[in-house]
Amino acid sequence: MHNTAINVQNRVLSVVRSVLQQNAISADVHPESRLVDIGLSSMGMVELMLKVEAEFDLILPQFEITPENFRSVKAMERMILNQLGSGSG
C-alpha cells in the first residue's frame, strides 16, 4: 500500500475511533469493519462525515455522501483518496 493511502487509512481509523468513543461505542475497528454493524447510528454517521471533512480539509460533494462511501474505513479511504487526487475541497 502506498504511503499516502496508509496515512489516509490511519487518519480515518483515528476519526472513526473518536466518533465511536464519543458515542459510547466500544468496538474493535478494522479497515473492513462495517460501521453500521458496530453500532454507529445515522447521527453518528453525520458526525463522522463532518469530522472527516475537518480532518482532511475537504468539503465533500453531495454525490459522495452515500451509504456506500461511509460503509467502512476502507470505503471512506477510497473516497478521500479520490477527492484528494481530484483537487476538490
Curated annotation (Swiss-Prot):
PTM-bearing positions, type O-(pantetheine 4'-phosphoryl)serine: S42
Domain Carrier: residue ranges: 6-84
GO cellular component: cytosol; membrane
Entry keywords, A to Z: Phosphopantetheine, Phosphoprotein
Entry superkingdom: Bacteria
GO biological process, alphabetically ordered: lipid A biosynthetic process
Pfam families linked to this entry: PP-binding
Molecular function, one GO term: acyl binding
PTM comment text: 4'-phosphopantetheine is transferred from CoA to a specific serine of the apo-form of this carrier protein.
Record InterPro entries: ACP-like_sf, PP-bd_ACP
Function comment: Aminoacyl carrier protein. Can be charged with L-glycine via the formation of a thioester bond between the amino acid and the 4'-phosphopantetheinyl prosthetic group, catalyzed by the bll6282 ligase.
Protein name: Aminoacyl carrier protein 2
Organism expressing this protein natively: Bradyrhizobium diazoefficiens (strain JCM 10833 / BCRC 13528 / IAM 13628 / NBRC 14792 / USDA 110)
